[in-house]
C-alpha cells in the first residue's frame, strides 16, 4: 500500500494481538485491501481517495499468527520511498498504484545502518553488503562485510538455517549473483568484491582457499548448495580454483562436477522440471549484471531546464531469450514448492540502485516496475497457497528526489513525461561528480500472509532476520 496511509498501519498494530484468523487456506481476503487505485477523477471531490470503506474487519481477517510454510522475501536494492514514488508517478500516474509493491496490506518502516569496523559506532549510511548481512544473519556489521560481524566472524544466515531445517532454498537477482545482496545468503567473506579466486587472494586473503579459508563467494556458494540460484555473474565462473579438491579447474567445471545444472537462457530455464539437492539449478543469464528494462538519458546539470522532457524506451539489449525478474521468480517458486517442508526464497531487483548511482531515472524506474511484477507473482502464489509469508522491502535508500519542474537545482536533473502527460522532474543531488550515493532514511517494509503483522510499526533491519526465522520456525 502507499506509504502515506496511516489507517492500515494503526489497525495492524492494534490488531496484531487479536485471536487467530480463519485457517489460511479458507481465508477470503477483501479485494479493497489490495486495490489502491484512486477512485475517480483527480479534480473531483474525493476523486483522489484510495480507500472508500472502513477496512477494520477486512484487515482483521487478513491477520494470521500461524507459522508460515514458505517465505518469499523481495528486495528492491536502493528502493526508498522516493524511488517507489518516482516510478509510480511515471509508470502508473498520480492516482495509480503498483499491484505488487503497493498491494501488501501491512506496512511499517525500519531503520538501517552499518557499524564502523574499528569503533563499533553507527555508520548511518549503509552499503548493500552490511545491510544484506543485517537481515540475513541478524547482525550489524561494517560496510563491505558479507555474512561476517565487525570482528570478521561468520554468522549463519537464513538460507543456511532453512536448509538445516529441511526447506528448499532459492536466490534470485538481476545483478551478478556474487553481488552483495545475493552473496549474503551464499557466503561469508570479509570484503564484498571477493567474487572469485583472483579477487579473494588479493582482497580477502584470510578467506582464500590457498590460505586455509572457505574460498571466494562463488566457491562458497557451490558448497552451500542452494536449490535454485538465478541471475547474472557468468564471467566469474571462468576463473580457476587455486587450491582444494578442484584446484586447476574452472568454477563452471567445478559446478558441473558437483552435480549442478546450468542454464543460460529463457528456453533452457523453462525446460527445467525439478531442482533439488540431487541436482541444484544455476541460471546464468549475463556475464555481469542483467540488462535493464528501460533506457533514457542520464540526468545533467540543469537538465530539467535545458533539456526536453523524455519518455523511457525499451532496452534492445534485453532480448526475449533473457528471463525477466518476474519469470525467474515464477520459475523459482514452481521448483521450490515441491519440497514438502516448504521453502525460503529471496528475490532482488538489483539495478534500481545501480541506475540511481548512475543518475538515470528511466533505468531505475524500469527496474522498479520489474520488481513490482515479481512481487505480483509472489503475492498471487501466496494468496492461493495460504501458507506463504511475502515481505517486500529495500536494503537502503537512495538519492533521487521529485522536485518542482522549474527548479534550478544544484544537482543533476532530468524531466520526464508521465503516464498522466504531466512533467516530472527528478533530481540527484548528493554527489558532485561520479556515482550518486546511498542515503540513510528509514525504509518501507510491507508484508502479506502468516505473521505479516510483525513488520508493522518501527523495526530495525536486523528484525527482519528474526521475523522470518520465527515465521518459519527455523532452529539451529
UniProtKB/Swiss-Prot annotation:
Leader sequence segment: 1-26
Record bears the keyword Magnesium: yes
Residues where Zn(2+) 2 binds: 77, 395-396
Residues bound to Zn(2+) 1: 353, 357, 438
Keyword set, alphabetical order: Hydrolase, Magnesium, Metal-binding, Periplasm, Phosphoprotein, Secreted, Signal, Zinc
Cellular localization per UniProt: Secreted; Periplasm
Binding-site residues for Mg(2+), renumbered to this chain: 77, 179, 181, 346
Catalytic activity: a phosphate monoester + H2O = an alcohol + phosphate
Modified residues (Phosphoserine): 128, 206
A single cellular component GO annotation: extracellular region
Class of the enzyme per the UniProt entry, highest EC level: hydrolase
Gene Ontology MF term list: alkaline phosphatase activity; metal ion binding
Entries under SMART domains matching the protein: alkPPc (SM00098)
Active-site residues from the entry: 128 (phosphoserine intermediate)
Cofactor(s) recorded in Swiss-Prot or TrEMBL: Mg(2+); Zn(2+)
Note: There are 2 known alkaline phosphatase proteins in P.aeruginosa strain PAO1. The larger is well conserved in strain PA14 (this entry), but the other is not well conserved.
Stated role: Has only phosphomonoesterase activity.
PANTHER family given in the database record: ALKALINE PHOSPHATASE
Family: Belongs to the alkaline phosphatase family.
Name by which UniProt lists this protein: Alkaline phosphatase H
Native species: Pseudomonas aeruginosa (strain UCBPP-PA14)
Amino acid at each position: 500500500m502507499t506509504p502515506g496511509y496511516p489507517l492500515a498501519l494503526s489497525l495492524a498494530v492494534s490488531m496484531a494481538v487479536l485471536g487467530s484468523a480463519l485457517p489460511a487456506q479458507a481465508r477470503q481476503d477483501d479485494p479493497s485491501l489490495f486495490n489502491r487505485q484512486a477512485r475517480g477523477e483527480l479534480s473531483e471531490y474525493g476523486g483522489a481517495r484510495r480507500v472508500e470503506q472502513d477496512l477494520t474487519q477486512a484487515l482483521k481477517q487478513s491477520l494470521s499468527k500461524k507459522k508460515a510454510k514458505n517465505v518469499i522475501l523481495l528486495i528492491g536494492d536502493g528502493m526508498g520511498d522516493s524511488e517507489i514514488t518516482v516510478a509510480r508517478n511515471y509508470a502508473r500516474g498520480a492516482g495509480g498504484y503498483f499491484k505488487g509493491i503497493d498491494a501488501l496490506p501491512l506496512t511499517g518502516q525500519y531503520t538501517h545502518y552499518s557499524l564502523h569496523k574499528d569503533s563499533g559506532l553507527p555508520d548511518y549510511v549503509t552499503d548493500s553488503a552490511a545491510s544484506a548481512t543485517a537481515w540475513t544473519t541478524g547482525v550489524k556489521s561494517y560496510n563491505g562485510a558479507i555474512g561476517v560481524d565487525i570482528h570478521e566472524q561468520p554468522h549463519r544466515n537464513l538460507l543456511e538455517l532453512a536448509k538445516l531445517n529441511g526447506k528448499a532454498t532459492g536466490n534470485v537477482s538481476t545483478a551478478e549473483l556474487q553481488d552483495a545482496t545475493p552473496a549474503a545468503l551464499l557466503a561469508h567473506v570479509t570484503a564484498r568484491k571477493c567474487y572469485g579466486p583472483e579477487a579473494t587472494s588479493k582482497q580477502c586473503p584470510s578467506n582464500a582457499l590457498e590460505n586455509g579459508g572457505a574460498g571466494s563467494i562463488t566457491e562458497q556458494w557451490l558448497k552451500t548448495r542452494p536449490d535454485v540460484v538465478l541471475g547474472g555473474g557468468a564471467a566469474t565462473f571462468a576463473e580457476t580454483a587455486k587450491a582444494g579438491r578442484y584446484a586447476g579447474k574452472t568454477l563452471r567445471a567445478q559446478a558441473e562436477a558437483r552435480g549442478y545444472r546450468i542454464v543460460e537462457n529463457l528456453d533452457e530455464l523453462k525446460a527445467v522440471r525439478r531442482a533439488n539437492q540431487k541436482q541444484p539449478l544455476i541460471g546464468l543469464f549475463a556475464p555481469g549484471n542483467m540488462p535493464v528494462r528501460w533506457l533514457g538519458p542520464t540526468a545533467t546539470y540543469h537538465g530539467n531546464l535545458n533539456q526536453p522532457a523524455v519518455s523511457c524506451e525499451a532496452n534492445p539489449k534485453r532480448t526475449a531469450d533473457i528471463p525477466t525478474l518476474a519469470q525467474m521468480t515464477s520459475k523459482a517458486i514452481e521448483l521450490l514448492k515441491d519440497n514438502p517442508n516448504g521453502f525460503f526464497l529471496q528475490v532482488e531487483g538489483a539495478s534500481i540502485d545501480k541506475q540511481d548511482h548512475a543518475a538515470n531515472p528511466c533505468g531505475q524506474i524500469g527496474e522498479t516496475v520489474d520488481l513490482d511484477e515479481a512481487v505480483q507473482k509472489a503475492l498471487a502464489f501466496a494468496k492461493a497457497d495460504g501458507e506463504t509469508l511475502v515481505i517486500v522491502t529495500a536494503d537502503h535508500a537512495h538519492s533521487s528526489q521529485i522536485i518542482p519542474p522549474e527548479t534550478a537545482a544544484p544537482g543533476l536533473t532530468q524531466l520526464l513525461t508521465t503516464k498522466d502527460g504531466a512533467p516530472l522532474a527528478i533530481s540527484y543531488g548528493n554527489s558532485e561528480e561520479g556515482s550518486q550515493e546511498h542515503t540513510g532514511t528509514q525504509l518501507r517494509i510491507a508484508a502479506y500472509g502468516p505473521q505479516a503483522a510483525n513488520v508493522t510499526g518501527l523495526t530495525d533491519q536486523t528484525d527482519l532476520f528474526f521475523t522470518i526465522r520465527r515465521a518459519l520456525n527455523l532452529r539451529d
